[in-house]
UniProtKB/Swiss-Prot annotation:
This is UPF0102 protein NMCC_2054. One of its GO terms (molecular function) is nucleic acid binding. Belongs to the UPF0102 family.
Length: 115
């Protein structure tokens, strides 16, 4: 297993533990479709959250928040739409969030990254 993959998996583990501590329940992890991958799909109350997890060892290259590009955001949005369609989830409240982890700092939960 490559180092980046191991770090990404550790970041997802930390993000999931954080979200669970906030009352979220895991529905799916590393969900794939033709449009891309959704790192975590969780339920928080009556809302489904589609979560992009970003991990960086440090703030080099502008930090972790800068790593979600417009093209990545578009892929995430298309993946979310496909997930909802495939699971016949209509009129279900949902949101696209991110959990950002930099080094040993506590995770930062950014809600509604689509604005």
């Amino acid at each position: 297993m490559r180092l980046n993959h191991k770090q990404g998996e550790a970041g997802e583990d930390a993000a999931l533990a954080f979200l669970q501590s906030q009352g979220c329940t895991l529905l799916a992890r590393n969900w794939h479709c033709a449009y891309g991958e959704i790192d975590l799909i969780v339920k928080n109350g009556g809302m489904i959250l589609f979560v992009e997890v970003k991990y960086r060892k440090n703030r080099q290259f502008g930090g972790v928040a800068y790593s979600i590009s417009p093209s990545k955001l578009l892929k995430l949005q298309r993946s979310v739409e496909y997930y909802l369609q495939q699971n016949r989830l209509t009129n279900v409240p949902c949101r696209l969030d991110a959990v950002l982890i930099e080094g040993n700092r506590p995770p930062e939960w950014i809600q509604n990254i689509t604005g």
